[in-house]
């Protein structure tokens, strides 16, 4: 048996291994937060597009929510607009919000849609303002309490939190075999735009749709223990203890909280996955061991 035949047999085995998962998840919704290095590396960008198209072709319903922080910062630098942060949160005034919406909706979203369509898929770009898809209000943040003084409210401008997801537009697009690509810009009651963390939008959409899975693509392998080993599965009830003892810290805390909210909202399973790994989405969905950290 020559090498070519052996390689073909291995490919066939991979397909057979994935068959039960294809059958299990057919007609199910999977929400994917697309961000990090996977959005800027050209090879990974194309692999992501092809992976999403494959999901749609085999009957799975993928919904994509994307980030774009580095692209926003690049344009702010070019316009000589100095960003300011409070407790790690970008303060978004009216001028900054214009840039955020311009980049997320007008550039990043269209590039993702264009790539998927170029690769043979049917993608449609949306922002949370379209069809009032993502309704929002201003995020409330408090300064740390000092002594007996009550904590003061911090004005972070047009930074929003999700109040409601109007899922009808997503359901309609999915039924017509389109892949929705969503920019995380929400709309307030007064019609103003709000900048919302993409993880939060993805989590809220997944919960509203009772999605089978929520996958957050990141630039780390997943949640690790204090020894640096990957924690492959976690129950959401374990998260508070891991945060309190310092196992989970920094930017990983809001990500696991998004997963917790999604599970409490009816999502079957959530995942924090290293988007730098080739075909990370397919490995998570269609292999026994998966990749990253599963939170359920």
From Swiss-Prot:
Pathway: Amino-acid biosynthesis; L-arginine biosynthesis; N(2)-acetyl-L-ornithine from L-glutamate: step 2/4. It comes from the Bacteria. Substrate binds at residues 68-69, 90, 195. GO terms for cellular component: cytoplasm. One of its GO terms (molecular function) is acetylglutamate kinase activity. The record marks 33, 255 as: Transition state stabilizer. One of its GO terms (biological process) is L-arginine biosynthetic process. It catalyses: N-acetyl-L-glutamate + ATP = N-acetyl-L-glutamyl 5-phosphate + ADP. The keyword ATP-binding applies. It is found in: Cytoplasm. The keyword Kinase applies. Its EC number is 2.7.2.8. CDD domains: AAK_NAGK-C. Keywords: Amino-acid biosynthesis, Arginine biosynthesis, ATP-binding, Cytoplasm, Kinase, Nucleotide-binding, Transferase. Pfam families: AA_kinase (PF00696). HAMAP family: ArgB (MF_00082). Catalyzes the ATP-dependent phosphorylation of N-acetyl-L-glutamate. Belongs to the acetylglutamate kinase family. ArgB subfamily. NCBIfam families: argB. This is Acetylglutamate kinase. It comes from Desulfotalea psychrophila (strain LSv54 / DSM 12343).
